[in-house]
């Protein structure tokens, strides 16, 4: 069986080209002012700093501006909330991203929820998640929304399919399940206390690995002809799924790296562009 490679890197590059054109139209209506994506990094975690740089580079590639806000490790919840309020009030800023995780003394949920829903381009607020769950307009959490874009691009059938999401985090597993449900898939969410996990996964037409444990999902748990989406990334270039054991048997799969990761950033940029278009009346 020759599997379809769900190439997120290639599709993200295509999306960036489309975003460039849309940003040009926005700037034509705003006297040349580019939309701004503001990213907030609290502390100096090297991985988080790398992600922030990658997002800034993506902004510049499509003609947007990136505002990088770095706060000290000892920042309090109140100080971070004040900074978010400042960015909410700045009409030049069309998207706000608070880099996860924040230091333990900060109430992360309160800070996420302080972001204006119109600028919640990373889909992290409870208001936005609730609207999405009720089929109302909202920006989706960037990683699952990126996965959905990738599946649609490659015309992977979802309606009536049995989908299993392994992981239930509020920014990945849960919104992923809601998006698949909205696409008329029949969805099962699995987690650390799921009984007979291999048997549940063997039923799946579509498997999404979203639990953050390297190669936790074994190849022999996955049936022939399944669509395999791996949202994990760990040292050594492996994800949450033992991909090497299924590439020859599955219908389609996301490579690690180069599958889900590039789509997360591309979706964040696309949702910021959409927010800027709404603000510009386009």
From Swiss-Prot:
Instruction: Answer whether the UniProt record assigns the keyword Ion transport to this protein.
Output: no
Q: Which reaction does it catalyse?
A: (6R)-5,10-methylene-5,6,7,8-tetrahydrofolate + NADP(+) = (6R)-5,10-methenyltetrahydrofolate + NADPH; (6R)-5,10-methenyltetrahydrofolate + H2O = (6R)-10-formyltetrahydrofolate + H(+)
Please give the Pfam families that the UniProt record associates with this protein.
Answer: THF_DHG_CYH (PF00763), THF_DHG_CYH_C (PF02882)
Keywords on this record? Answer: Amino-acid biosynthesis, Histidine biosynthesis, Hydrolase, Methionine biosynthesis, Multifunctional enzyme, NADP, One-carbon metabolism, Oxidoreductase, Purine biosynthesis
User: EC?
Assistant: 1.5.1.5, 3.5.4.9
Kindly list the cysteine pairs connected by disulfide bridges: none
What the entry lists under SUPFAM superfamilies is as follows:
Aminoacid dehydrogenase-like, N-terminal domain (SSF53223), NAD(P)-binding Rossmann-fold domains (SSF51735)
Among the GO biological process terms of this entry, one is: L-histidine biosynthetic process
Can you list the GO cellular component terms from the UniProt entry? cytosol
TM segment ranges? none
Please tell me where NADP(+) binds in this chain: 167-169, 192
The pathway that the record names for this protein is:
One-carbon metabolism; tetrahydrofolate interconversion
User: Is NADP among the key words of this record?
Assistant: yes
Domain of life per record: Bacteria
Q: Which PROSITE patterns match?
A: THF_DHG_CYH_2
**GO terms of molecular function:** methenyltetrahydrofolate cyclohydrolase activity; methylenetetrahydrofolate dehydrogenase (NADP+) activity
Write out the similarity annotation: Belongs to the tetrahydrofolate dehydrogenase/cyclohydrolase family.
Q: Give the quaternary structure.
A: Homodimer.
Q: Which HAMAP family match?
A: THF_DHG_CYH (MF_01576)
Q: What does this protein do?
A: Catalyzes the oxidation of 5,10-methylenetetrahydrofolate to 5,10-methenyltetrahydrofolate and then the hydrolysis of 5,10-methenyltetrahydrofolate to 10-formyltetrahydrofolate.
Protein name, as recorded: Bifunctional protein FolD
Q: Which species is the source of this protein?
A: Acidobacterium capsulatum (strain ATCC 51196 / DSM 11244 / BCRC 80197 / JCM 7670 / NBRC 15755 / NCIMB 13165 / 161)
Lineage of producing organism: Bacteria, Pseudomonadati, Acidobacteriota, Terriglobia, Terriglobales
